[in-house]
Amino acid sequence: MVELEILTIQNPEHLRILRSKSRQVQAVSPKLVAFAEQMLDTMREANGVGLAAPQVGVLQRLFVVELPEDKENEQPRETYILFNPKIVKGRGEQIGYEGCLSIPGYIGEVTRREQITVDGLDEKGQPVRLKVEGYLARVFQHEIDHLDGILYTDRLTDPSTLQPVETGEEEAAELEAASMGAAMS
């Protein structure tokens, strides 16, 4: 499958798209599901854990998330494709570092809800309600922000927490910070 181009904030036209609010998906079609699969492939190739449609230039309310297998804790890989996601409930607070494929070379500290309930549509167009917590809740909130034109840098706890990392290593640095900083929540 052909990889999609991931938009970055360095390009003014890309930034305009990234700052735009996405439209609701009218119908979950086979073509749209194939596009979501293409997004997953692109995200995997970029070593990401989440990708929202605006990050590949499509202003529709769709994101994909995939948490890698955690052999140490015997957790299988978790893959999510969600259309028209909406946070309907949240509680608790966690502080942690986030990176973004659209902001290469940086991570920053962001406060998010510890647990959220999200309504949306699955790949069959069926309504789903997901209750997620911890790191997965952080990733879902980050991707839903993209659908509203919000970048994680808009939510930094303090601008001084934005720090450079090797380009392409944002997600790895974020995962490392999450595993070391579980007590940060």
Q: Each predicted region: which residue ranges?
A:
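Positively charged
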Residues: 1-185
